[in-house]
Amino acid sequence: LHSDHFQNFQNMMEGKTYGRRMMMKFVMDTSWFHPITTKEIESVKIHNGTTFIPEEKMKDASGNFLTNAHLYRLYIYHWLMGHEHISQQPRLIVRWLEQKEAGMPLEIYAFIIDSSLAPYEWQRSQIVEHIIESMGWFGLRLYQCPSAYDVTNSNVYLSNKPVTYRKEDM
């Protein structure tokens, strides 16, 4: 008797499924969320060759630009929809998860058509690299806990002088 469980990949390897599932989370630094600027829209055009949605649809009902996070999620969804190695069946999901103290996770749930290990990992890496690269076009950053390097190289200087919060009389 075998007491360990195992995963049967035979159907996937024989092409009887939609591909191999890819589910990833990218934790975004919410301090970088803001209404998208025209500079960021131009950056997307330069790097992508076009905007993925017309500029008039980048505004809400009152005429204000949508946030860069909202448009980034739409961009990633449309980019994956057009990706030749992503299956359009059974589902493609790009969504925000509940915000945590470390940031707001963007979850990607998709199926990569190439189910063999090496091609799957190659395509998955290409997708991750594009997702990370394109964040900068929208003025976004991944969240990262401060490291010792960040603390020692910050521009905040500590002083042993007492701080006075009183306003000086003029």
Q: Can you name each region flagged by the protein language model?
A:
Residues 46, 52-170:
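Long, non-transmembrane cytosolic or organellar matrix-exposed soluble domains/tails
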